[in-house]
Amino acid sequence: MTKVAKKIAKDLLDIEAVFLNPNEPFTWASGIKSPIYCDNRITMSYPAVRKEIAEGLAAKIKETFPEVEVIAGTATAGIPHAAWVADILGLPMVYIRSKAKDHGKGNQIEGRISEGQKMVVIEDLISTGGSVLEAAEAAEREGATVLGVAAIFTYELPKGTANFADKQMTLLTLTNYSTLIDAALEANYIEEKDVTLLQEWKKDPENWGK
């Protein structure tokens, strides 16, 4: 666990982009009961936090994919972070819709990419990875070479890990669920007795709490 990972996890807790509540779980749209709720869009409203995130993502991308030529953001949550990262790296930026428009030119990708252009796709949050992997596939259909995905946070769900492995897609994240639990405990957002319950959710979210 790096200092940056723990600092960003703490920041997400402090600005209430992330809530942990193992005793009164949230219900996701999928029906899964979860002790965590994450809305990283809130980071846009905190200049110091969003700057730290953008600089962290830019540094990871530059280190892992020095050959990157274009930054893509997923619509809508990945767009602002992609714009800030592209600005730091001095690179072109595009964004990828979840599906093609049903009017005009029917674009799924907004902005310009060229055949073989090396791309990193930015997402704010990774659960199963389904939507961002579909975005990466859409970019490749348009001619891009997707080097990998970069995100602020991952729940570290087994299904997500398996999906990225299945697509042979590299995933970079600034922080993760395990680090968040450690940071929350240190900052007294949770108690020691909550830790096991929180850790159990990550292993089997579909059956947790049943």
Swiss-Prot record:
Keyword Nucleotidyltransferase found: no
Identify the cofactor(s).
Answer: Mg(2+)
* One family name in Pfam for this protein: Pribosyltran
Name the Gene3D superfamilies for this protein.
3.40.50.2020
Q: Key word Ribosomal protein present in the record?
A: no
Q: In which pathway does it act?
A: Pyrimidine metabolism; UMP biosynthesis via de novo pathway; UMP from orotate: step 1/2
InterPro entries per the UniProt record, alphabetical: OPRT, Or_phspho_trans_dom, PRibTrfase_dom, PRTase-like
Q: Which HAMAP family match?
A: PyrE
Subunit organization: Homodimer.
Q: What does this protein do?
A: Catalyzes the transfer of a ribosyl phosphate group from 5-phosphoribose 1-diphosphate to orotate, leading to the formation of orotidine monophosphate (OMP).
Which family does the record claim for this protein? Belongs to the purine/pyrimidine phosphoribosyltransferase family. PyrE subfamily.
The name this protein carries in UniProt is: Orotate phosphoribosyltransferase
Supply the gene name.
Answer: pyrE
